[in-house]
């Protein structure tokens, strides 16, 4: 019988000092991806990947934790400064930006890149609670 060896990949430190932090904040979750300037992902985290379930994923605290986790992982690759691209209407937008700054990343620019339709698809019906 052939014996399986441990084939877990080791992370290679990349030494990238500037990058882009993409914050996708929806009504249900917040996803933070940190890339280099070409768009290649270095680190990511989301509220759901950190163990938040259900309506707790959409809280600003969950977004803060996701941003901290992504920032720590990217700083292992030597990341120091980031531009921030924020997309979506969710509750965790500002909390995620503050968490990136508190984690030790220097923020050079903040852009809102939320896609706005020029009267495209019909929106979902209004909620009646």
Curated annotation (Swiss-Prot):
GO terms for biological process: translation. Keywords: Ribonucleoprotein, Ribosomal protein, RNA-binding, rRNA-binding. The keyword Ribonucleoprotein applies. The keyword Ion transport does not apply. Gene3D superfamilies: Ribosomal protein S11. InterPro entries: Ribosomal_uS11, Ribosomal_uS11_bac-type, Ribosomal_uS11_CS, Ribosomal_uS11_sf. One of its GO terms (molecular function) is structural constituent of ribosome. One of its GO terms (cellular component) is ribonucleoprotein complex. NCBIfam families: PRK05309.1, uS11_bact. Belongs to the universal ribosomal protein uS11 family. Part of the 30S ribosomal subunit. Interacts with proteins S7 and S18. Binds to IF-3. Located on the platform of the 30S subunit, it bridges several disparate RNA helices of the 16S rRNA. Forms part of the Shine-Dalgarno cleft in the 70S ribosome. This is Small ribosomal subunit protein uS11. The lineage of its organism: Bacteria, Bacillati, Bacillota, Bacilli, Bacillales.
């Amino acid at each position: 019988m052939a014996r399986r060896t441990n084939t877990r990949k080791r992370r290679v430190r990349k030494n990238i000092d500037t990058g882009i932090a993409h914050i996708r904040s929806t009504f249900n979750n917040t996803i933070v991806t940190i890339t280099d300037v070409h768009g290649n992902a270095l680190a990511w985290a989301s509220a759901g990947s950190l163990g938040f379930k259900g309506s707790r994923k959409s809280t600003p605290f969950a977004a803060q934790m996701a941003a901290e986790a992504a920032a720590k992982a990217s700083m292992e690759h030597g990341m120091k400064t980031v531009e921030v691209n924020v997309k979506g209407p969710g509750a965790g937008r500002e909390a995620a930006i503050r968490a990136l700054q508190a984690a030790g990343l220097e923020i050079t620019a903040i852009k809102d890149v939320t896609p706005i339709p020029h009267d495209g698809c019909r929106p979902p019906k209004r909620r009646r609670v």
